[in-house]
Amino acid sequence: MSKEEVLLRIQAVLDQVLDAKGIPRVKLSEDVAVMDGTLPIDSLDLAQIVIELQSVTGRDPFRNGFVEFRTVGELARLFAA
């Protein structure tokens, strides 16, 4: 899965999360910070996104411990082939 495909998947899961919360959708870009308050998500929402990415890509970049990432683009690169 390319980085662009991963970004689209992140957007799709984020849309589902926000729809379930009744929060307006947010358009992502690679430079959007994940957990600084820019996105209206919490750590459980982020975990849901990560689990979905692991499922669709077959990758687990966190297998050996936490890998730091700050932006949506950095997260996408962790899962891109």
Locate predicted features:
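Phosphopantetheine-dependent thiolation modules in NRPS/PKS and related acyl-activating systems
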Residues: M1-I41, D45-I51, S55-A81
